[in-house]
Regions:
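Donor-nucleotide binding loops and adjacent catalytic segments primarily
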Residues: 23, 183, 189-263
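Conserved nucleotide-sugar phosphate-binding/catalytic loop shared by glycosyltransferases and other
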Residues: 32-87
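Short amphipathic alpha-helix
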Residues: 16-26
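A nucleotide-sugar donor-handling region in carbohydrate enzymes
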Residues: 138-216
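A donor-sugar binding/catalytic signature common to diverse glycosyltransferases
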Residues: 107-111, 253-296
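Conserved nucleotide-sugar donor-interacting segment of glycosyltransferase catalytic cores
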Residues: 95-153
Length: 352
C-alpha cells in the first residue's frame, strides 16, 4: 500500500485547515492509503480536523515566524531563529532524508515546511508543497533577500509542484506553481439546535471569536454588552462576560459552530476567510497590514464574501457594534464552493 507522509506547519491552524480536506478526499479515493502526519500542531486538533486514519509523528519542517501575539511578528528573534535553523543545513537535510527513507515514504506533501521537501529531494522521493503562502516570501519580506531566503525558495522550486491554494500570494518566481481552487471543510449549519440548547430568543446573534490557532486573545471581559449579541469563545481564554458562551460546552465541532454563527471576528487568515465565504458567515477582521499574505486574502473575501475591517483599538475596547449592524444589513453573496481539495487529491492520486 502506498505511504504518504504529510508535513503540516504549526504556525497557526490555517495549514491544517488547508490540508485536512485533501487527506480526507485521498482516504475516500484510496482507502488502503497509509498516512503519516508530522506536525507540531497538537494531535487533538489534528484529529478534530482530519477524519482519515493517520499515524502522528511530532515534527518541525519549518519555524514560521516568531510572534509576540497573533498579529505581531518579532523580526530580530525570527532572523536569529532562521540563522540557527540553517547553521548546519546540510546535516539537517541529511537527517531528514534518512528519516523519510526509514519511513519508506512513497510521496511527501508539505504545508509548507521546506525541510521535508529538501529531505525528499535528497532521498529521491516525489514531493510537493501545498499552501497559500511560502516561507521564502515571508522571510524575505521581514528579514531581507539573502542566502537563507534563496535556499528556502530553492527547496520550493525543486519540488514536483507548489500547489498554491487560492486565495494566496502571487509567487511569480516559482517555476513549478500550480494554482488550485479554494480549500475548505465546510461545517453543517445547526443553528436551530443551538437556539434550543441555549434557549436563545428570536433574533439573538451568535458571534464567533477566533485567533486562528495563534496564542493570544481579545479582552472580551472589557467589552460592553450589545443587546441581542452573544460571544462564542474558547475555554482556555477564561472569559468572564455575561454574554460569553464557551465553545467546548456546546459539544459541537468547530466547523458546525462556525457555520451556525452570525459573524466571525478574526485576523486575516486562510482558514478563517475561506471557511467564512463557504459558510456564508460575515467577517470582522482586525488589520494585519504588515503580513504579506493579507492583501490577497482580503481582496478575495471582499469579492466573494461579506467583510469589514475594524481597528485593533476598536476590538480591544469592544467598540464595533455599528460595524456589526452594518454588515448584518447587507445582502449575503452566494457561498463559495471549495473545489481545491478534490483538485489536489486528484493530482496526488495520479502520482502515487
Amino acid at each position: 500500500m502506498p505511504h504518504l507522509v504529510v508535513s503540516i506547519s504549526g504556525h497557526g491552524f490555517g495549514h491544517v485547515a488547508q490540508t485536512a480536506p485533501i487527506l480526507d478526499r485521498l482516504h475516500e479515493r484510496i482507502p488502503q492509503l497509509r498516512l503519516t502526519v508530522r506536525s507540531a500542531v497538537p494531535p487533538s486538533h489534528l484529529h478534530s480536523r482530519i477524519h482519515a486514519p493517520f499515524t502522528y509523528l511530532p515534527g518541525e519542517g519549518d519555524i514560521g515566524m516568531e510572534m509576540s501575539s497573533a498579529l505581531d511578528v518579532c523580526v530580530d528573534e525570527s532572523r536569529a531563529a532562521y540563522r540557527a535553523f540553517h547553521a548546519d543545513w546540510d546535516a539537517r537535510v541529511a537527517d531528514e532524508a534518512r528519516l523519510l527513507r526509514e519511513l519508506k515514504a512513497d510521496f511527501i506533501l508539505s504545508n509548507v515546511g521546506y525541510l521535508p521537501l529538501a529531505g525528499a529531494q535528497r532521498a529521491g522521493i516525489p514531493n510537493a508543497a501545498l499552501c497559500s503562502l511560502n516561507w521564502a516570501d515571508i522571510y524575505r519580506h521581514y528579514c531581507g533577500d539573502n542566502e537563507i531566503a534563496a535556499r528556502i525558495r530553492d527547496c520550493y522550486a525543486k519540488a514536483d509542484a507548489f500547489l498554491r491554494a487560492s486565495p494566496g500570494m502571487a509567487m511569480h518566481d516559482l517555476p513549478n506553481l500550480v494554482p488550485v481552487a479554494p480549500i475548505a471543510a465546510v461545517g453543517t449549519n445547526r443553528r436551530e439546535e443551538l437556539n434550543r440548547r441555549l434557549e436563545l430568543p428570536p433574533g439573538e446573534k451568535l458571534v464567533l471569536i477566533s485567533m486562528g490557532g495563534i496564542a493570544g486573545r481579545w479582552p472580551v471581559e472589557r467589552w460592553p454588552r450589545i443587546a441581542g449579541v452573544r460571544w462564542l469563545v474558547q475555554q482556555s481564554w477564561q472569559v468572564s462576560h455575561p454574554d460569553a458562551i464557551v465553545l467546548e460546552t456546546l459539544q459541537m465541532s468547530f466547523g458546525d459552530l462556525f457555520a451556525s454563527s452570525d459573524a466571525l471576528i478574526c485576523k486575516p487568515g486562510y482558514g478563517s476567510f475561506v471557511e467564512a465565504a463557504c459558510s456564508g458567515v460575515p467577517v470582522l477582521y482586525v488589520s494585519r497590514a504588515d503580513w504579506p499574505e493579507s492583501p490577497a486574502l482580503i481582496a478575495w473575501l471582499e469579492q466573494h464574501g461579506l467583510c469589514r475591517e475594524v481597528s485593533r483599538n476598536a476590538l480591544e475596547q469592544g467598540n464595533f457594534a455599528e460595524t456589526l449592524e452594518e454588515i448584518w444589513s447587507m445582502p449575503q453573496p452566494e457561498p463559495v464552493i471549495p473545489e481545491g481539495a478534490n483538485q489536489v487529491a486528484d493530482w496526488i492520486v495520479m502520482r502515487l
